[in-house]
């Protein structure tokens, strides 16, 4: 597991200055397509996101923490409750009904110490989802 993380870290950061490396890691993880993949949603198996090529907030932020800590950045996890029906997304009628029936879910992101401040860093929403209106 660690070797695949180390390889990607080297690929994404090699030859970059600290800020450029931090941004590159964020963008590469953010651009992994969002998908719920239960087999990689644990602290033991999250690195599989690199071979599966998709994942939800949980493996994305476990990976982000690993890589940011390699850059010397302290990272904390943050968990937010949310409801799918509260998102300002124009769901088709059948999906709106499903979203309204869903219980409260939990979202994982990170707070990263940058310049002495804890900054919220959320790499969940890839570009196609952003175009749909997800935050």
Predicted region positions:
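Hydrophobic/aromatic-rich core segments of domains that either
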Residues: 12-14, 62-135
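Generic serine detector
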Residues: 3-4, 42, 56, 85, ...
């Amino acid at each position: 597991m660690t070797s695949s993380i180390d390889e990607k870290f080297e690929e994404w950061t090699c030859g970059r200055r600290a800020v450029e490396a931090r941004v590159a890691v964020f963008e590469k993880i953010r651009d992994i397509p969002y998908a719920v993949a239960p087999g990689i949603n644990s602290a033991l198996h999250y690195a599989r996101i690199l071979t599966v090529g998709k994942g939800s907030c949980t493996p994305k932020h476990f990976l982000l923490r690993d890589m940011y800590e390699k850059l010397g950045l302290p990272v904390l996890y943050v968990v937010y409750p949310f409801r799918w029906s509260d998102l300002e997304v124009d769901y088709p009628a059948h999906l709106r009904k499903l979203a309204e029936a869903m219980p409260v879910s939990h979202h994982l992101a990170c707070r990263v110490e940058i310049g002495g401040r804890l900054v919220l860093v959320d790499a969940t929403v890839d570009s196609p989802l952003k175009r749909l209106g997800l935050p």
